[in-house]
Amino acid sequence: MASDDIVVGLDIGTSKIATIIGNTWQSDPEKIEIVGVGKSPSEGLRKGVVVDIEKTTASIRESVKEAETMAGVQVGSVYAGIAGGHIMGHTSEGVVAVAGEGHEITKSDVDRAINTAKATATPVDREVIHVLPQDFSVDEQEGIKHPIGMSGIRLQANVHIITGAVASVQTLLKSVNNAGLSVEDIVLEPIASADSILSIDEKSVGVTLADMGGGT
């Protein structure tokens, strides 16, 4: 069965740069068939941060080319992983009034609450990478995971915001762009690892995942 599209992950690490290409299907969005992998020694990075754009770009090209050859496709865009000591996280809250008929909470209300939390002052030298909803409060009821469909006057979103240093994020993007690739999105590497390895039950109970990379 022919795939509908391809998805490409690019792991820009301190010791190596890895590329993975997968086929995807709209009929089964959870399914990914790995068709190409590539890796190259990482040049131009120190502890996960690009310190030499030209060398990093060359390493990216080498890794992507190897994966393209295996998959028999040409890559135009990637999801790029990011890590490093410049990554920081903080919690934030966003509160909105529920304005729908009967004060029933909709997805629009949830999105507004999350965006309000995201809009809290972020220093000019920081760039938001992820906004991760933790839970919600409806009026006086706390710890709600899925508020859509509930009724209330006041909706509060409690989120965890992950940011990176603007200079480090933009330098990473430039290195990828210089390799002839656009970036679909930036993903924090520990989150990517957790989503690919841990089960829902493990995340719910609580587990520690340690990624011992070259820059650790």
Predicted regions and their residues:
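Short, intrinsically disordered, charge-balanced linker/junction segments flanking boundaries
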Residues: D211-T216
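Nucleotide/phosphate-binding catalytic cleft detector across ATP-hydrolyzing
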Residues: M1-T14, I20-A210
